[in-house]
Amino acid sequence: MEEKIQLKWYEKRQGIKLKDKIKSEQKKKEFLEKQNLKKNSDFEKNSQAQKKIRSLKKSKFVKPLENLFASEKIPEDAKKIIEEFDKVVESTHPLNSKQKLLLPKQIRSLSHFLTDERGERRLGYMNQTVLLSAYVHYYTWWNLVRLVRLFSNIDKKFFDVKDSSVFLDLGPGIFSVPLALFLSRPELRKKHITFYCLDISQQALAFGENIFLSVAARLKCEPWKIVRVKGELGSSVKEKADFVTSANLFNELCDDFKNPPDFLAKKCTEQILSYLKLENENARYIIVEPGDPRSARLVSLMRGSFMRRGFFPVSPCTHFCDCPMDGKKGGKWCNYAFKTDDAPAELKKLSEKSELPKERAVLSFVAFQKSKDGQIDGCNCFSDER
C-alpha cells in the first residue's frame, strides 16, 4: 500500500504546496525505477558476457582430456604391433620355457630395484641381461602404450619436419621413443631421418635397435638410419639435431643429483640446447616423465627454463605463465592419465602375474618448439580431474 504524501510542518512553513511535492515525489520514483532497470539490464549483459567468455574458453582454449589420449587416432597397424609386442620381442630375443616362467618374478624384482632400492642401483643397470629382458617385456611395452597414445594425439604440425632431419633421443634404453614415433606418426616413416640414440648401455642400444628393425619389417617400411652413441647426457654427438626427445630420463638422473631440482632443470636445459640445431627456427624438444610429483616438478621447471631461452610450449599448455600445478612440496602437480582398459591383453595378464597391475597410465610432459621471435599466438590448456 502506497504511503499517502503529506506536507511536513517545516515544508508548510517554507511555503511548499502539496501538489508540487506530489509531482516531485513522482519524478523521484520514476528516476529510481529507471536506475533499477538500467542496473538489471547491465547485470544481464554482464552475465551474458561472462557466459560467452566461458563458452569461448571451453571451445577455443580448453581441450578436454580425452582429446589428448583418443585411441581412435592411433594408426591401425600401430595398434596391431602394440597388441603383439611380446611376439616382436620373441622374434629378436626369444626366451626358453624356464626364462618365461621366471619372467614375472624378475619383473617384480626389477620394480623393487627401480623404486624401493633407488639409492642402491647404478645407472648402468641396463647392462645386466636379466634386468634388461624384464625391462623390455614389461616397461618398454607399457611405455609404448603411453607414448604411442600421446604422440598420436599431439598436433601433427609438431611432427612436420623436413626430409633428412636429424633426431636425437636421450637415454633411450630400449628405443621406447623411436619406436613410439615410428608407430604413431606414419608421415614420419616416409622421411629419411637420421636417428641418434644416446645411452650408457651398449647392450640396451643393441637390443633396442634389433626390435626397431623388426617393427619396421613388420610394417613393411624402410627403417630410419639409426646411430647408436654410448655415453651419458652431455656426451658429444656428431651432428646437431633438429628434434630432441627424452622419456623417463630425468626421473633417474634425480637419484644421483644432490642439488635442488631448479638447478638440475637449468643444467639439463643447457645440455639439451647444446644438442639442438638452434639456427633452425623450428627446432623441437619433447620431454616425457612419469606422472609422480618429483618428475612433474622437474618438467614444470624445465618448461620455464626453455621458455626463458626462446622456446614456446606446444603441448599440453601453450600459455607463457608459470605453471599453476608446479609440484612444489605439498602442492598439486601436473600429470595426465588415461584408463588402460584397452591395453594389450597379454600385457595386462603379465602385469597381474608380476603383481604390478595398471588401471591407469600416467605421465607428465611438455613439447617445445623454437619460435621465430620468441612469441606465440593462442593458448590451449588441458585439464585432468585427479
Regions found by a protein language model. Give the residues of each.
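N-terminal auxiliary segments of SAM/dcSAM-dependent transferases
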Residues: 4-121
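Class I SAM-dependent methyltransferase Rossmann-like catalytic core
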Residues: 121-157
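Conserved class I S-adenosyl-L-methionine
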Residues: 163-173
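S-adenosyl-L-methionine
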Residues: 207-238
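A short SAM/SAH-binding and catalytic strip from SAM-dependent methyltransferases
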Residues: 242-262
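C-terminal lobe and adjacent flexible extensions of AdoMet/dcAdoMet transferase-like proteins
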Residues: 344-386
